[in-house]
Amino acid sequence: MRHQKAGRKLNRTASHRKAMFANMAASLITHEQIVTTLPKAKEIRPIVERLVTLGKRGDLHARRQAISQIRDQDAVRKLFDAIATRYASRNGGYLRIMKAGFRQGDNAPLAVIEFVERDVDAKGAADKARVAAEAETAEAA
């Protein structure tokens, strides 16, 4: 019996699940919106909500706790500088999950998870900078 066993296994080992959630949390903080399957979105929501609360605390111990959880310095910097100040007056409920139909290949239910008051320009900003840099080097060569 699996009474009182909270959380989804998502057909992964514990270490794979932990790494996947760390990567998804870093991506969500960086881009402020990601598309994933509905069960993964429901599992990542409380993790990122706790990270935003750590960012609102803002002290060194909270920063180190966030780094130990998502292991991405740039994402933690954005979390503590931009996102935490944006949600300073909000007590929880930083994310929304919207259903986004079904995936073509396996009919898995998809969802968009995003910050409630997100920065629209943040999505894909890193990719735009990378593409611009590649185009610049191509012109120079």
Curated annotation (Swiss-Prot):
The gene is rplQ. GO terms for biological process: translation. InterPro entries: Ribosomal_bL17 (IPR000456), Ribosomal_bL17_CS (IPR047859), Ribosomal_bL17_sf (IPR036373). This is Large ribosomal subunit protein bL17. Belongs to the bacterial ribosomal protein bL17 family. Part of the 50S ribosomal subunit. Contacts protein L32. The lineage of its organism: Bacteria, Pseudomonadati, Pseudomonadota, Alphaproteobacteria, Hyphomicrobiales. It comes from the Bacteria. Disulfide bonds: none annotated. Keywords: Ribonucleoprotein, Ribosomal protein. GO terms for cellular component: cytosolic large ribosomal subunit. Pfam families: Ribosomal_L17. One of its GO terms (molecular function) is structural constituent of ribosome.
